[in-house]
C-alpha cells in the first residue's frame, strides 16, 4: 500500500486570484479525504500566494487523516508550526520569485539551521520530513540532522527533456530511495507528478507516500475533485499490484 498526500495549494491559488472565499481549500481537503487521500499537504509560503494561515488553523481541527504542512526553514514558520502542531512538517526551500519549488533543500549548506529546526519541531511532537534532491550526500545530511523522513524531489524526473533523461532520473530516484530506506529513513516523493508519470515512481517499493497536488487540481476542473483523487489513488495502488 502506498499513501497519497493530496496537496491543496492550487485550490487556494484559484481563490487568491480574485480574493473570494471560494473555491474553499477546506472543502477540497475534506473531499480529498473522503475520496482516498491518506494525508493533506499544504504549503504555507512566506509570500502567502495561495495557502493562508487561517487555512492551516482551520484544517488542523477538521482533518481526519494527517496534516503535512510544508514550509521554509524560517523562524516565522517554525514558530507557527510549533504552535499549530501538524502531524508532519516537510521543510522545503523557498525563493520568493520562484514559480514553484525548484529543487531540494540544501541540508548540507544549511546544516546548523536545519538541525536546530528539526530539534525544535521534534520536541514539539511533529514528525519532520526534508524535501531533498535524490543525492546520497543530502540524504546522509538528513540522517545527521535527525529527520526520520525525506521526500525525494521528483521535479527533475518530471521535467526531463527526453525519455532517455527521464529514465536516468528515474534510475537515480530508484537507487536513492533504496539507499535512504536501507539507512532507516521513511522515503516519500513528490513534485510535478501527474497521471502519466506517476506509475514508475509509485512502483518503487521503498517509497511510502507520494505528495501530489497541481495535477490533481488541474484534472479536477474536468472530472471533479473527488474523482481526480480517486483516479490518482487507484493508479498508485495498481502500480504496486
Ligand atoms: C515542495 C513541493 O514540491 C510542493 O509541495 C510545493 O508546494 C510546490 O510549491 P507550489 O505548491 O507553490 O507550486
Ligand atoms: N511536495 C510535493 C507536493 O506536495 C505536490 O507537488 P505538486 O504535485 O503540486 O507539484
From Swiss-Prot:
It catalyses: 3-amino-2-oxopropyl phosphate + 1-deoxy-D-xylulose 5-phosphate = pyridoxine 5'-phosphate + phosphate + 2 H2O + H(+). Pfam families: PdxJ. The keyword Cytoplasm applies. CDD domains: PNPsynthase. Gene3D superfamilies: Aldolase class I. 3-amino-2-oxopropyl phosphate binds at residues 7, 18, 192, 213-214. It is an enzyme of class 2 (transferase). The active site is at residues 43, 70, 191. Keywords: Cytoplasm, Pyridoxine biosynthesis, Transferase. Its EC number is 2.6.99.2. It is found in: Cytoplasm. Catalyzes the complicated ring closure reaction between the two acyclic compounds 1-deoxy-D-xylulose-5-phosphate (DXP) and 3-amino-2-oxopropyl phosphate (1-amino-acetone-3-phosphate or AAP) to form pyridoxine 5'-phosphate (PNP) and inorganic phosphate. Homooctamer; tetramer of dimers. NCBIfam families: pdxJ (TIGR00559), PRK05265.1-1 (NF003623), PRK05265.1-3 (NF003625), PRK05265.1-5 (NF003627). Belongs to the PNP synthase family. This is Pyridoxine 5'-phosphate synthase.
Amino acid at each position: 500500500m502506498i499513501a497519497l498526500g493530496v496537496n491543496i495549494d492550487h485550490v487556494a491559488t484559484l481563490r487568491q486570484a480574485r480574493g473570494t472565499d471560494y473555491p474553499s481549500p477546506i472543502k477540497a481537503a475534506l473531499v480529498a479525504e473522503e475520496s482516498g487521500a491518506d494525508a493533506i499537504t499544504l504549503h504555507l509560503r512566506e509570500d502567502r500566494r495561495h495557502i493562508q494561515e487561517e487555512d492551516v488553523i482551520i484544517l488542523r481541527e477538521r482533518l481526519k487523516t494527517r496534516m503535512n504542512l510544508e514550509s521554509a526553514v524560517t523562524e516565522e514558520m517554525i514558530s507557527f508550526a510549533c504552535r499549530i502542531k501538524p502531524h508532519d512538517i516537510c521543510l522545503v526551500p523557498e525563493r520568493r520569485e520562484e514559480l514553484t519549488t525548484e529543487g531540494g533543500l540544501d541540508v548540507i549548506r544549511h546544516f546548523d539551521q536545519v538541525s536546530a529546526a528539526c530539534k525544535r519541531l521534534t520536541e514539539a511532537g511533529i514528525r519532520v520530513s526534508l524535501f531533498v534532491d535524490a543525492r546520497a550526500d543530502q540524504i546522509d545530511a538528513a540522517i545527521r540532522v535527525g529527520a526520520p523522513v525525506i521526500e525525494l524531489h521528483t521535479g527533475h524526473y518530471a521535467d526531463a527533456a527526453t525519455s532517455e533523461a527521464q529514465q536516468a532520473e528515474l534510475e537515480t530516484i530508484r537507487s536513492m530511495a533504496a539507499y535512504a530506506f536501507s539507512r532507516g529513513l521513511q522515503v516519500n516523493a513528490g513534485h510535478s507528478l501527474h497521471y502519466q508519470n506517476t506509475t514508475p515512481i509509485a512502483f518503487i517499493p521503498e517509497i511510502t507516500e507520494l505528495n501530489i497536488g497541481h495535477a490533481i487540481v488541474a484534472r479536477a476542473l474536468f472530472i471533479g475533485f473527488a474523482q481526480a483523487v480517486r483516479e490518482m489513488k487507484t493508479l498508485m495502488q495498481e502500480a504496486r499490484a
